[in-house]
């Protein structure tokens, strides 16, 4: 069968836009499509180590120079010609739900913000912050040692999680910083939410959205700029037309961007803000410490408490679980809990202040751990546990001030054992904790050193739900279910891109 006519999950699609500069480097950068036999098995051999490439700084390295845990001081080589190359990665054949005689499971994805590999005790024995709930999740499921975020900053990673594709494919770089639109997810783009809705799931997102949405002014003109003045122009009686409800989610409660950082300090419920902001945020009473900077002087709504944002998000997720149990317990659900913790400023809730011996940021990490524990506890209490896959990860590595200050004051390294932090191409910027739990399906206490990326969640959910991904969706997503269910050692991917 001609390569381009092979089924989506039986091929690796490579899309190139070659320039003269790339052509000069063909001898150093020859990529061949993968071929499959009649059983659609991957006809490739496991490599001793994997490669991690930057979208803007990319070329294969000799096998002997690939990164491993002992390569922390070796930089990614400065590579040529990547900006003109788009590489499509598709999911490879995997164990199906039917083969394992499984009903469609509920899926819960908990995404921390700026939580480093070394911030979690089960990844870092020298961590100064206790994370008993995340550690327990690892003991009850599978811990991945080589998981990566598709980007080293918030917005591109979230776009990739929601779409299963790299954000550079739509020309996006950087971070969405305000209330201006439009949504960065294209209108007709298949998302993880819309895919699961098509498969009969109830879908919900609670927390930060951070991939853009459009407000309108009183004249009905869309607000497309960020900053204080555009926020002042918003007509809050008009609905949002390109938010989570229009990108695959039945329920949404959260914020447009970082709830304690950006210009609009107000909650969105569904497609509008029920309690609009009325004044400039007063930062005078906010905590003062090395981790307290980073919030802009935006507009704030009455009752919006910057120190209790994550507890509000947690309560909304718990209310969703309880309501689903009462109204439609036999219908599968997808819950995406998108936390603010532990993004700067480090404003742990009042119940968590001085909960650790690692300062306010340590307390914030402890609050994130509490959130994980509270959600898992509620899922189990409601009887959802055995048929729910819980995934936990972070959108990128730890922030620069947190790493620098925590190293000095508490001998805690949130990037340990990797070099680099958030925004870096170094391993510490994109290697993230990733844990999966599914009782009686995923072996408790197991560990995988497979190289995976957060883009892989969508293809995995497609297999779990019985969805068939079209060729123009989730191009960079690989199904990791064979590793989760069967602990397959067959390599999921040859390399990982990040931007």
State what each model feature region is:
Residues 8, 12, 16, 33, ...:
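Generic alpha-helix initiation/capping and coil-helix boundary signal
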Residues 73, 80-91, 95-499:
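Formylglycine-dependent sulfatase
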Residues 1-33, 44-71:
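Short, strongly patterned local motifs
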Residues 44, 50-53, 57, 61, ...:
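N-terminal cationic amphipathic segment used for targeting or macromolecule association
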